[in-house]
């Protein structure tokens, strides 16, 4: 927000700070000032002149030879190329020796043989941006009102002896999106009460009820709506003081009605809108929800298609404005307008923000409604706006307002105590200082025993909890006044078991060769349900920024697939990613969604880098399976991880398995379906996703120290011919159960399938390792254990020992 330093000073009788000092003081209290611009820093010798005569340059069709009276005794000749210059005008003159923005210095010169002693200026040449220059003067010089005295400083007249503070208003301080709000903030800083804006003293005639009535169909979306009438008006340029205030705030002046609505918006932070009463076509205004695909042409000339849920102002039949966003061209105030219906309203901030984003239409009004506003200042703003329009247009202010009021008045009281304030802020503030701070803020303080009860004015709707009160105390007391103190005793920090486990998981996966990815939690409706661990409903955003980010994810894998596709499109063919993040599932009613932490991974391409020592190895199911099993072992989980063949949409039906831990399904591992791979230009790609809570909650084994064995181990190799559907986990379990206490390790070292083995058969070869920590094993011990294993395999799995 652009804030005029001179306008701020108008609120106070004795202002003690320079513009630079004010900027620094506001920044110290929590509102960032991005810059302070002195408007007159590059201006000098610019005065009001009167064009006594104007004739065409004898040697140039587009130049005019003007005789101009300034503050000098004799008039001077100035050659001017502006198409709108004419005799009798009061204009802005940069005299010889004047300085203008951009480093331009005015010198006496000859133009096509004629002497020019100065320059008649446009507003752009004085430093105003072209977007704020009134359209009537966009292509030429600026013509001043006829009553302006010749020779006076144009810098002072145009308010350029000013500084502009560029305030970065954060969403929590929307109260500062008005000059009145800024004045209260400044008043708290300098410990002065700001003067309240006063409206012109204009008498009223007649009754607004005779002109119009109002109906609001949805009070929740429009808690307050009112119309103030002004008749017999004359549309013309606004006075210079109003135009310069608007231009310095970055707003283009239009006419004395529209400019007043913009001025009131700047002053109070309360948007107003003016309708040409005679164009409304009805004596009744109905505020309702838009119909699906209903259309309106807005003031910018664009035809806009509305959605159900957008609030519109109608004449009972068709929309004449999009509530809180922009008016309709149909009821626009023009030079022929004689009666104005002035709207002041409070709309739901969420609905206005939603409509603004969906229509891609952001205005000064929608910004303020979206961020929230003081619901109890609208009457004051409407009265001030109506009176000012009547004064500037010579119109008649109609008595009363037509309103629908469904607001609920509630006193905002927050309780705290001095001990708590000092403990949390680390200060030693006294009660007297607290009383002074709240007096400076304009808050009402009531002291009851140890309790401090603070009544917050409605202009500070951002303050709702005790923490907000403490922040206000810290701001006004001064952040730089809060002493820096070290804790009296040292507190030993430490990680929780779950934090340690997460670090172990990340370190293990990165050590295994996977790279950590961070993807968006927001996804499209299509991707929201893909490859999820659960069938729970998805969570849709009520106001999404785009269709691609309209839902909260239920699985991390789709985003990893997109990341892999992105990398491969850029010739990074070997991709190995993992992500530990949150997924979301909808709950019944308006309850918050269920949040679960998941671990997901993806590999594609080759697993090892190609060099002269290594042969490239394409990724496969078992690479990722081994990584997951290694992770479970690294976490010290006591129970064994089991794998169960399954089918899952978008995964290969023959290469997908569920992960079973302690009897519960905790995730899946599988190859992407060829059709999915084709959609993303991927080749052999494997993914997994696991519920992290299941890993963290699993029973852990205690770490027990075992000395290095003193006695040698013995090994036996077994080659088994089994049914093709018999998996490694089942075989390992049988071997483990019957191998006895001497069996310490089982290692699969070969799998073979072929026609020579017979139909639906496969061969698996294992190395069994035996060890006794107390004595040297003998052949008989190992053979006895091996025989038991063989018998069990033959009996339970019908295995044939090869």
Go through the PLM ranges and name each one.
Residues 1-206, 341, 364, 368, ...:
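Phosphate-backbone binding interfaces of nucleic-acid-interacting proteins
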Residues 24, 64, 195-294, 607:
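Glycine/proline-enriched, intrinsically flexible loops and inter-domain linkers
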Residues 41-44, 203-204, 490-496, 519-537, ...:
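Beta-rich nucleic-acid/ligand-interaction surfaces
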Residues 48-78, 150, 255, 261-330:
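Conserved mixed alpha/beta core segments that line enzyme active sites in large multi-domain catalysts
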Residues 112-131, 136-143, 155, 163, ...:
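Mobile "lid/hinge" segments at catalytic clefts and subdomain interfaces of large enzymes
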Residues 181, 414-418, 422-575, 716, ...:
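Extended, well-folded interaction surfaces typified by the phenylalanyl-tRNA synthetase beta subunit core
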Residues 190-216, 395-421, 428:
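Terminal amphipathic helices with adjacent charged low-complexity linkers/tails
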Residues 440-443, 594, 600, 608-802:
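A carboxyl-terminal module marker
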